[in-house]
Structure formats: C-alpha cells, structure tokens
C-alpha cells in the first residue's frame, strides 16, 4: 500500500523531473576571439575543436590516452584517392608542392634522354594533410589578429615628487646605491639597491644627467 505522500504525487499534474541535466556537454559560446568563434564546430567537444584548429586545450602533458579517429577502410581509400593528384598532373608540373611526398618527377633531355633534373615532391596527401592545412590557416589568422590588436606597453613615468626624491638621493650619494639603500631618512620605504639603480638610471636619462 502506497503512502499518502506517494498518492498525492501520483495525482499531481506536475511531473517529477527525472532528467535535471538535458545534456551534460557544456554549450560553449566563444566571445573573446572572432576567428575561433567563426571556425568553432558546436557538434564537436572542446578538445576536438582545439585539435581541429591546431591549438591545445591544456598546456601541460596529457594525463590519459588520445581519442582515436576511427574510420572504415572504404572511407580511408576514398579520401586518399580524392586527395592524391593524377599521374598526368604530376608529369606536367615542375612545382614540388604539387608532387606528393615520397614521389619525384624525373626530367630528361629530349635529344640525349639523359636525366637533367629530379624534382622531389613535398605535398602531403591524405585526410591528415587537409586538417593540417586548415589548422595552419587558422593559426596564421590568429597570429595576424594578435599582432594587429597587440597593445603597446607604455613606459611608466615618475611623478614630480619621485623625481625630487631621486634628485636628493643622487646629490647626497652620487652613484653609491648601497649607501642610498641604507639611508633611513631618504629611503624610508627601504627600496633595494637594484631598484634604486634602475630608478636613478631612468631619472638620469630623462634629465640628461651624467
């Protein structure tokens, strides 16, 4: 026999929330960088997106294994056939970037049939090459964006009161920074000798003092 509380729950129109979290995958919205936002695939996880873009989600060493890219043999063969150029294209080109890596084009003299030059291919083929090309283009865009939006570091300018203090220290002790450091009347904040040296050097440069 069910309890009174259970009977009330069964009669209630409000159903029990059996699934509090609809999707455990966090819906990530990229707002900080427009290039990453434009190339972000919401169907992939954070790790997969970063790998696709040629970035790393974590700078430290990986604690576990890597996710394997599982494909059928027919898919691999179809991708290789689509990415690999035809023999006729290789015979007509002299650009190493258009010849697959591991192959070469031999150019012979039409009269003597002697080998005049050998062009070794540098083009990477296969699905890995496509992802590498895509990620490298994104990285190039990110580098250009970072260079364009980089903030110029502003040099700190000492105040009039600080200039007056440095002038008093220099007049009293010259370039003896150890004495400046132990001067309890002027060096009330106990600045180190190295810090005083840097401040005095900048002060000298700003006021043309030798």
Swiss-Prot record:
Annotated region (Disordered), positions in chain: 1-27
Family classification: Belongs to the NOP16 family.
Major location category of this protein: nucleus
Pfam family, one: Nop16
GO BP field: ribosomal large subunit biogenesis; rRNA processing
Record note on quaternary structure: Component of the pre-66S ribosomal particle.
Species assigned in the record: Debaryomyces hansenii (strain ATCC 36239 / CBS 767 / BCRC 21394 / JCM 1990 / NBRC 0083 / IGC 2968)
Keywords tagged on the record: Nucleus, Ribonucleoprotein, Ribosome biogenesis, rRNA processing
Function: Involved in the biogenesis of the 60S ribosomal subunit.
Matching InterPro entries: Ribosome_biogenesis_Nop16
Gene that encodes the chain: NOP16
Keyword Metal-binding applies: no
Lineage: Eukaryota, Fungi, Dikarya, Ascomycota, Saccharomycotina
A GO-annotated cellular component: preribosome, large subunit precursor
Protein name per the record: Nucleolar protein 16
Subcellular locations according to the entry: Nucleus, Nucleolus
């Amino acid at each position: 026999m069910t309890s009174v509380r259970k009977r009330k729950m069964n009669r209630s129109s409000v159903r029990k929330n059996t699934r509090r979290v609809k999707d455990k995958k966090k819906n990530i919205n990229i707002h900080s960088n427009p290039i990453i936002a434009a190339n972000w695939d919401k169907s992939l996880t954070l790790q997969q997106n970063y790998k696709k873009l040629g970035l790393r989600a974590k700078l430290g060493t990986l604690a576990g294994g890597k996710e394997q890219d599982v494909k059928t043999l027919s898919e691999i063969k179809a991708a290789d056939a689509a990415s690999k150029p035809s023999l006729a294209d290789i015979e007509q080109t002299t650009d190493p970037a258009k010849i697959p890596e591991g192959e070469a084009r031999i150019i012979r003299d039409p009269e003597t049939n002697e080998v005049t030059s050998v062009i070794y291919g540098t083009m990477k083929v296969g699905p890995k090459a496509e992802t590498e090309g895509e990620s490298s283009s994104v990285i190039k865009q990110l580098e250009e964006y970072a260079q364009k939006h980089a903030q110029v570091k502003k040099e700190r300018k000492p105040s009039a009161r600080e200039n007056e203090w440095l002038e008093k220290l220099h007049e009293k002790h010259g370039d003896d920074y150890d004495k400046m450091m132990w001067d309890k009347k002027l060096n009330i904040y106990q600045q180190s000798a190295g810090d005083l040296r840097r401040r005095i050097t900048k002060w000298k440069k700003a006021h043309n003092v030798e």
